[in-house]
A protein has these predicted regions:
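C-terminal membrane-adjacent module
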Residues: 110-197
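Alpha-helical transmembrane segments
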Residues: 1-10
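Alpha-helical transmembrane segments and their membrane-interface exit regions
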Residues: 29-39, 55-60, 78-87, 158-163
Length: 197
């Protein structure tokens, strides 16, 4: 799923800079495939039918020159949805999302100082997602399609990766007295988590 997700922004950017409607269509079908990937991996027949039907339905707006408008939606919708996910977990009586993930990855009792820290990391991700949403909407309204695409389909993902790596490095430095796995091992464990939201 992670690697499947990386393909979409690259296809979307390629579609924008080449003005190729076939690549626009492929990017939108790829996005639909990501949305249906869980059901398709569970071999649900309806998911494959939905992918085929959705692919056919996406062909007409793309060929009518409207595909670019659909490509503007994910760079704003994804950070908005993630912001809501992180922010709702910060409500009173809820366990912050990053805290829940850390507890699932941690062996043994979860230390109090890490409970406080992971709450702050959840707040950090709220701020990052809000900034990416504002950036995506502002660029969609005021920038050229090529600049919008470069920023939202390339630079925004670099920012996400940089924040992730910086937070990981800071946590290893600040909380070095706790056991930490290497970055690649940490990423593998993170991708295996089944989180109920």
């Amino acid at each position: 799923m992670f690697w499947l997700g990386l393909g979409y922004p690259l296809l979307a950017h390629l579609a924008v800079v080449t003005h190729d409607r076939r690549i626009e269509w492929l990017a939108l079908v790829w996005l639909l495939g990501i949305a249906l990937s869980g059901a398709m991996m569970q071999r649900r027949p309806w998911a494959w039918g939905a992918l085929l039907a959705g692919s056919a339905l996406l062909w007409w707006p793309v060929m009518a020159g409207k595909g670019l408008y659909a490509l503007y939606v994910p760079p704003a919708a994804i950070p908005a949805a993630l912001f809501m996910l992180f922010a709702l977990s910060l409500r009173a009586g809820e366990v912050p999302l990053v805290t829940r993930i850390a507890i699932l990855m941690h062996d043994g009792p979860f230390p109090d100082d890490l409970v406080v820290y992971t709450r702050h990391v959840t707040q950090l991700w709220c701020a990052v997602c809000a900034a990416l949403f504002v950036s995506a909407v502002t660029l969609a309204l005021f920038a050229s399609p090529a600049l919008w695409s470069l920023m939202t389909n390339v630079i925004h993902y670099v920012v996400l990766g940089a924040v992730f790596v910086f937070e990981y490095g800071y946590r290893r430095w600040r909380y070095g007295h706790y056991e930490h796995s290497g970055l690649l091992q940490y990423l593998r464990r993170l991708m295996r988590i089944r989180l109920k939201v």
